[in-house]
């Protein structure tokens, strides 16, 4: 039922593959066991599932998850998600994806095409719509950055990689004790840098 096709990338907590699941093209994230920080590995796996029951056009959808398959000595679990391609906003902004390299005669002058105002507005609206939905469900992403915004072939932005996310319980968001230091330091929210509580 699940067949891994090719690697798409890897990060601190695992690897992502293009795969097929019941005949549909999907992305599979295998969360690896960390010998250095086992608790962080487990927390990352379960944090990814914060969005498991949610469906929104601007959020990468979780299809299934398992702590058993595919069996691997080094894997904590597997998360099967909708396949949205492997182009991110990071590729678009910094011209790091081969798909976005346009040559030397472009507006950016660095082998990449500058974003048009229309693209910038559309991408911003997609991201804000996705964030508003997540916040309405009590979920804060905590690692929002261009590399975690995927762009589909149709040009729709989808928020992904919820390994640092946190589900705020009813009334808990007002607690001064709810703060998280996960995520990418250079993209961390100002309130977290100041040691304040998480806000949605």
UniProtKB/Swiss-Prot annotation:
SMART domains in alphabetical order: S_TKc (SM00220)
Record carries keyword Hydrolase: no
The reaction(s) this protein catalyses: L-seryl-[protein] + ATP = O-phospho-L-seryl-[protein] + ADP + H(+); L-threonyl-[protein] + ATP = O-phospho-L-threonyl-[protein] + ADP + H(+)
Active site: 143
Presence of the UniProt keyword Nucleotide-binding in the record: yes
Superkingdom in the source lineage: Eukaryota
Annotated InterPro entries: Kinase-like_dom_sf, Prot_kinase_dom, Protein_kinase_ATP_BS, Ser/Thr_kinase_AS, Ser/Thr_Kinases-Pseudokinases
UniProt entry keywords in alphabetical sequence: ATP-binding, Kinase, Nucleotide-binding, Serine/threonine-protein kinase, Transferase
EC code(s) of this entry: 2.7.11.1
Protein name stated in the entry: Serine/threonine-protein kinase mos
């Amino acid at each position: 039922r699940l067949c891994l096709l090719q690697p798409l990338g890897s990060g601190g907590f695992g690897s992502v593959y293009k795969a097929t699941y019941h005949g549909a093209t999907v992305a599979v994230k295998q969360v690896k066991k960390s010998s250095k920080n086992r608790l962080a590995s487990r927390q990352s796996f379960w944090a990814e599932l914060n969005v498991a029951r949610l469906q929104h056009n601007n959020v990468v959808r979780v299809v299934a998850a398992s702590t058993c398959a595919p069996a691997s000595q080094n894997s904590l679990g597997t998360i099967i998600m909708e396949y949205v391609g492997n182009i991110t906003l990071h590729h678009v902004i910094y011209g790091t994806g081969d798909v976005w390299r346009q040559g030397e005669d472009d507006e950016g002058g660095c082998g990449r095409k500058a974003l048009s105002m229309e693209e910038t507005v559309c991408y911003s609206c997609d991201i804000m719509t996705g964030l508003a939905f997540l916040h309405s469900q009590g979920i804060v992403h905590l690692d929002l950055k261009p590399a975690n915004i995927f762009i589909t072939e149709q040009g729709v932005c989808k928020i992904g990689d919820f390994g640092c996310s946190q589900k705020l319980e009813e009334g808990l968001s007002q607690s001064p004790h709810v703060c998280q230091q996960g995520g990418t330091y250079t993209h961390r929210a100002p309130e977290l840098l100041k040691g304040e509580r998480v806000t949605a």
